[in-house]
């Protein structure tokens, strides 16, 4: 498991869904979101964790944030907003299933995101703690 390997894997999952994948922190994602139309994937690796027990270091785990988003219709068109949320939910759950098959995961937090970024986007976000 490497930093680039994880990014490449998310890129592969995005390609399987015919969605572009972009990497960056919160401020980069906000800036990029202004120019993106249609559905897409954001990925970030904001950190990791190393635990120790009485005998040795445990496996290093890394936190991976994946957002699957589309153009938000929040508070303007409920039907279109639900369509975006449904579409992106299907993609995020597919990615989650593939991630836990490929890596060991301590768990995942899935959060609905609506009307985020300056150019509003809605969809789903998953935070995975992955290790080998």
Positions of predicted regions on the chain:
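Charged, amphipathic alpha-helical segments and their flanking helix caps
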Residues: 1-26, 30-31, 45-132
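A short, hydrophobic beta-strand-centered structural micro-motif
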Residues: 35-47
């Amino acid at each position: 498991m490497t930093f680039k390997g994880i990014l490449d894997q998310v890129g592969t999952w995005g390609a399987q869904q015919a969605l572009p994948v972009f990497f960056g922190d919160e401020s980069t994602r906000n800036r990029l979101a202004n120019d993106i139309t249609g559905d897409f994937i954001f990925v970030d690796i904001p950190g990791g964790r190393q635990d120790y027990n009485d005998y040795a270091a445990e496996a290093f785990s890394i936190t991976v944030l994946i957002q699957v988003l589309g153009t938000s219709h929040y508070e303007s068109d409920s039907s279109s907003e639900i369509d975006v949320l449904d579409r992106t939910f299907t993609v995020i759950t597919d990615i989650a299933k593939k991630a836990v098959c490929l890596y060991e995961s301590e768990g995942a937090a899935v959060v609905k995101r609506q009307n985020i970024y300056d150019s509003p986007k809605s969809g789903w976000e998953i935070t995975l703690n992955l290790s080998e």
